[in-house]
Amino acid sequence: MNYPHPIIAREGWPFIAIAAVVALLIHAVGGFGLAWPFWLLLVFVVQFFRDPPRAVPTQANAVLCPADGRIVAVETAHDPYADREALKISVFMNVFNVHSQRSPVDGAVQKVEYFPGAFLNAALDKASAENERNAVVIQTGAGHTVTAVQIAGLVARRILCYVRAGEPLSRGQRYGFIRFGSRVDVYLPKGSRARVSIGEKVSASSTILAELPEQP
């Protein structure tokens, strides 16, 4: 299980440093009685930016979960990024989940599109169309198209994506991060079979979301 990233995500290092300095300064001036809420805040920030390695299933037609969280949608829907009817599976991340995003399949990035938008509660269905979001369209070696959409939430105001069109992605590979609560929508080819249900807790990479059909 090779995961070449720090167990505490780099995206969080500045926030952790600021929280630690503030806690230390207040502790030095007013003691633990005054500083304990800031130490608690530091613990929260550290846990928010944790980014542990995960086991990656090897099943050939498996679509892996791109994020930790809870399933809030499993439905047939239009994929506006690949202009097709698709199976849509949505994962909602609260502030206690790991917030890095990992590729659901092996493939090549066909396009990356960013859309500015609102910051509604990411658990709501309308967040898919109205919130700030970033779509990554991936084509597998077998010719299947898989779309993964990072969606900002009520608190999240910063979507980070580290891949560009033409670049390869491996299943389980870390490709993005959303700070402070968010959602990821995955659009799959018609004929894909969902392996999760609404309300189910899922883990990035190690949970199989769905199985792709044999033919594109």
From Swiss-Prot:
The modification Pyruvic acid (Ser) is found at residue 182. InterPro entries: PS_Dcarbxylase, PSD-A. Its cofactor is pyruvate. The active site is at 182 (schiff-base intermediate with substrate). Binds 1 pyruvoyl group covalently per subunit. Pfam families: PS_Dcarbxylase. It catalyses: a 1,2-diacyl-sn-glycero-3-phospho-L-serine + H(+) = a 1,2-diacyl-sn-glycero-3-phosphoethanolamine + CO2. GO terms for molecular function: phosphatidylserine decarboxylase activity. Its EC number is 4.1.1.65. One of its GO terms (cellular component) is plasma membrane. Is synthesized initially as an inactive proenzyme. Formation of the active enzyme involves a self-maturation process in which the active site pyruvoyl group is generated from an internal serine residue via an autocatalytic post-translational modification. Two non-identical subunits are generated from the proenzyme in this reaction, and the pyruvate is formed at the N-terminus of the alpha chain, which is derived from the carboxyl end of the proenzyme. Keywords: Cell membrane, Decarboxylase, Lipid biosynthesis, Lipid metabolism, Lyase, Membrane, Phospholipid biosynthesis, Phospholipid metabolism, Pyruvate, Zymogen. The keyword Membrane applies. NCBIfam families: AS_decarb, PRK05305.1-2, PRK05305.1-5, PRK05305.2-5. PANTHER family: ARCHAETIDYLSERINE DECARBOXYLASE PROENZYME-RELATED. Belongs to the phosphatidylserine decarboxylase family. PSD-A subfamily. Catalyzes the formation of phosphatidylethanolamine (PtdEtn) from phosphatidylserine (PtdSer). This is Phosphatidylserine decarboxylase proenzyme. It comes from Burkholderia mallei (strain ATCC 23344).
